[in-house]
Amino acid sequence: MTKTIAVIGVTGAQVRYLSALLTDKHTERSQGGSVANKFLSLGWNVRGITRSATSDSAKAQAAKGISIVEADLDSTSTLIPAFSGAHVIFAVTDFWQPFWESNARLSKISDRATGEHCYAIEVQRGKNIVDAIQRVLKEEGTLERFIFSTLPGFKEQSKGKYTYVYHFDSKAEITKYLKSKDELWSRSSLLNMTFYSSNIMRFWPLTKVSRLLFPLGFVVDRCCYSPRTVIDT
């Protein structure tokens, strides 16, 4: 029997939206898309979950053999049939699309307004995903693994020192909610992808020093080691 993986984030809308704003170009690279493409190459049935099956990116994924299913992360009832029958579910939630859609307006209110707004949206959508999967697991029992792309909570780990890192704290809050669902949590794995290497080429153009050397600067403590593994997405 060929197994099925359902992938949220298959069209990479969050990456394309930001890229379009800053460079007026779109990209087909995304975390969800890379997962879908990999499992497709392994012979799995891949179900791509997206808001619009008629978008150009959704059509491009469908042309590869990915089954595109429409669902709304703001509506648990639309997610349940999208997850039904899947053996594996991969989900990445989106902080940045609502951020760039609302920042020009909300940043005039306060320096926290946009972050708080997007935090609330992402957390609720993450909880909707968890609730829908929990429902499918209880009714069908066929789910083998749920993989959630998350991040550590800055506020918690800094003991309240850093409170502005909303895009980390939102995913950490979703993870906390997931852990409260005992049966689902026992079948869950967490993936921490703190930074996409593809963003380097998109937002920090590199200057070539030699044939193999492209310096890239990040501000870190001098005592801090910051190893980076390049993964093709």
Predicted regions and their residues:
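Oxidoreductase cofactor-interface core, primarily capturing Rossmann-like NAD(P)-dependent enzymes
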Residues: 2-59, 74-76, 95-106, 113-119, ...
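Conserved Rossmann-fold cofactor-binding substructure of NAD(P)-dependent oxidoreductases
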Residues: 53-88
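Generic alpha-helical scaffold signal
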Residues: 62, 83, 120-123, 127, ...
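Fungal eukaryote-biased detector of long internal structured cores
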Residues: 78, 121, 128-144
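Alpha-helical repeat scaffolds in large eukaryotic proteins
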Residues: 87, 134, 154-156
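Periplasmic-binding protein-like
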Residues: 90-93
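Short-chain dehydrogenase/reductase
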Residues: 126, 130, 175-178
